[in-house]
């Protein structure tokens, strides 16, 4: 679930950390659900006060989820819960230590199928370009990132699944 609240000027705002003060409203992270809440004025009904929904709310949600995911990915990397590059991810997947993966959105179909071939049930988030993933790993471009089964990676996996659901309409994997 993702949380929304409203500012003192009565604008609906996306609460990417889920910790902003005030009355909040939790919504399923699918784009269609958020759009439905906007269209049917569910925010005003839930907050028990008239609120304004910004025209770019969907963009704010996507940007906020991306920002939060990349931030948590950086923390997981510093905590040693991340491997990258196809061979390293494949090894982690095969020995059971990887429980989640990121795949570049702009990867070729062949590159996307390589990892799926080994573990079809592995959850994958394909919401970032190879350059965005590369920047997080200190490289120019990265196609595959594996998230290891560690306690520190749990918030990252939860946020990445929300982002994937919001961007793709369904969880992949």
Question: What feature does the model see in each segment?
Answer:
Residues 1-45, 49:
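N-terminal cysteine/histidine-rich coordination modules
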Residues 9, 32-34, 106-109, 131-132, ...:
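Conserved nucleotide-binding/hydrolysis micro-motifs of P-loop NTPases
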Residues 24, 39, 65, 85, ...:
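Helical mechanochemical/support elements of P-loop NTPase systems and associated helical scaffolds
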Residues 32-102, 106:
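Extended interfacial segments that mediate partner engagement and assembly in macromolecular machines
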Residues 97, 115-119:
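Short helix-coil boundary/hinge micro-motifs
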Residues 113-116, 158:
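Short amphipathic alpha-helical segments
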Residues 120-162:
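Short basic, glycine-rich beta-strand/loop surfaces that mediate nucleic-acid
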Residues 165-173:
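N-terminal targeting/trafficking signals and adjacent low-complexity tails
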């Amino acid at each position: 679930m993702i949380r929304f609240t409203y500012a003192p000027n009565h604008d609906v705002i996306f609460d990417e950390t889920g910790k902003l003060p005030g009355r909040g409203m939790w919504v399923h992270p699918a784009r269609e659900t958020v759009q439905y809440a906007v269209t049917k004025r569910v925010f005003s009904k839930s907050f028990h006060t008239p609120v304004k929904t910004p025209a770019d709310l969907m963009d704010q949600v996507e940007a906020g989820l991306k920002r939060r995911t990349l931030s948590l990915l950086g923390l997981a990397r510093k905590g040693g819960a991340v491997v990258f590059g196809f061979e390293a991810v494949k090894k982690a997947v095969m020995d059971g230590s990887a429980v989640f993966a990121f795949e570049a959105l702009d990867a070729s179909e062949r590159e996307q199928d390589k990892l799926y071939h080994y573990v079809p049930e592995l959850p994958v988030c394909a919401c970032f370009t190879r350059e965005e993933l590369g920047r997080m790993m200190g490289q120019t471009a990265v196609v595959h990132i594996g998230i290891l089964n560690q306690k520190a990676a749990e918030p990252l996996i939860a946020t990445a699944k929300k982002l994937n659901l919001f961007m793709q309409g369904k969880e992949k994997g």
